[in-house]
Every structure is written in C-alpha cells, then in structure tokens.
Amino acid sequence: MKKRLLAAVLAGIMVFSMAGCSGTNSDSASDNGTDTQAGDTDSDEEQTEIQVFIAASLNTVMTDLAERYNEDHPDVKITYNADSSGTLLTQIQEGYECDIFFSAAQKQMDDLEADGLMVESTRANVVNNQVVVVTLKDSGTAVTGLEDIGKAESIALAGGSVPVGRYTRQAMVNLGMLPKADDVAAITTEEVSEALGGVEISEQDNVSKVLTAVVEGSCEVGTTYYSDTYGYEDDLDILQTVSYDLTGNVIYPIARVINEEADDAQTAAAEDFLKFILSDEAKEVFDSYYFDTNVE
C-alpha cells in the first residue's frame, strides 16, 4: 500500500502549522491538489496522525476546523489531501492510505461504498453547496448567467469527473443547452464548447483551479461553488447562483475509509474527528464559510 507521503506525487504542497499559518484563503486560489498538515506542536509528545481526503472546495473551512479541533486535541496531527473528489476516490482505490473521505458529491461516495472501502454506518451528509457563475469584479462581461455564458471570450470549466463540472453540465442539459445524456459527466469539454458556438474553454481538474483561472484573469468567467467565493468578495462578482432545480442538491457526504494500516490510536482519532465534523460547533463554522448545513 502506498504510504502517507503523497507529496511525492502531488504538485503544490502546502504545509499548515498551528503556529504559522491562518485558515483563510490566500491572495490567490490554490491551483493544485495539496497536502495540508494541522496539529504540529513543539512538545515532545508523540502525535497520532490521521489522513483526511477532502474535496478542494473544503480546504479553507477544514483548515479552520482542524485548528479548532487541535485546541482540545494537540496530540492529533490531521493531514489533508485536497483535490477533486474523483481524483481522491481514484487514489483511495489505488491504495493510498486514508482514514476519512469528505466528497463534494454523492457519486464518489457511492463508488467508495460499492467497492467495499467504507467503514459501515459511518456515512453522513454534512453540507449543501450551490453552483455559481463568477467573473472578476467590474470585468464588463456581457454574460449574465449560465444561459448566455457563450457570450464570454473564455470560460474556466471543471472536467466532467469533477463534481462542479458535472453539476454545471447537468444544469446546461436541463436548460436545453446540451443534449440529454445517460451520464452528464461523460459530456466532454469539446462538446460543451461546440454547443456554445465554439467558445474557448479552459478545462480544469478541480474547483480551486477554476477559481484561480478567474481570479487571475486568464478566463473571463467560470463556474465554481458559492463557498469558494469566501474571501474573494472584493475580487469577484457572482453573475448567477444556479438553482437547485437545475443542478440538483450539491450534497457533501463524509465517511470513514477502511485503513488496514491504522493502529488503535489512529482509528480512535479518526472516529473522534469525524464526530467533531458532524457536531453543532462544526456546523456553525461551515455556515460562516457560506455552506448550507440544513441537510438530511
């Protein structure tokens, strides 16, 4: 089984230490899958490390939550691997060590469960999100929302295997902009471009990269999550908040992953951290980062 050090295969490593970094967005969005470590201390006390795979759109809020958790549990080191849910699922299926999977869509969690990789009775829905169409503030774009997004000179769009890309494609199908498909995730970026009259589309492999493309001005518009606009209120205009009637609910499920390498301390730490994520205290934090915690 591949060991914990995903840094060897993932570009763009960010190390978060309780003493040195804040849990807020930096000036530019993260544009790579990242490993984030929380819970480092200066004491000689041995720490128990848990591996938590999180959708890229959860990076900021989960860093904050880890900081809060470590105030009472300094003996636990939480190592995050943040990327698209599809990429994370593939890594788990390939044998990367993981204790908790927090996905941005039900499909990836369904696949995890079907593969027998989930700890039974640990799955829970945590938050809901919403797809938004964004542009740089005062960009002067002619685009007003998804229905006329083809007016843009360039679009940042996540691939179909990325939840936000799939939700965007589903909305476009429901608007009649794309033909119906058994699996909207299979609609290629080239097909989307063709349906929009040949507009230039920059395909991104996670939602953070979509945000980066818009914030840095390399694309005129993009589709991301409402929660991703946290910290960018002065930089971005939300052109449209896409209705759930078009996308369906954007539910984020969480579950523990079977980890045969974990010892008793690691298993207990993973169980306790999952309980914390589902707590009322954590719900208040999610709410503050623009997530909707009114889910079943």
Language model features with spans:
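Positively charged n-region of N-terminal signal peptides that target proteins for export
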Residues: M1-L5, L10-G12
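Short, high-confidence coil segments that cap the C-terminus of an alpha-helix
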Residues: D75, E97-C98, C219
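A short, gly/pro- and small-residue-rich
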Residues: D115-R123
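Exported/periplasmic ABC-transporter solute-binding proteins
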Residues: S22-E67, G86, Q106, A114, ...
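Ligand-binding clamshell of periplasmic/extracellular solute-binding protein-like
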Residues: Y80-T90, E97-E113
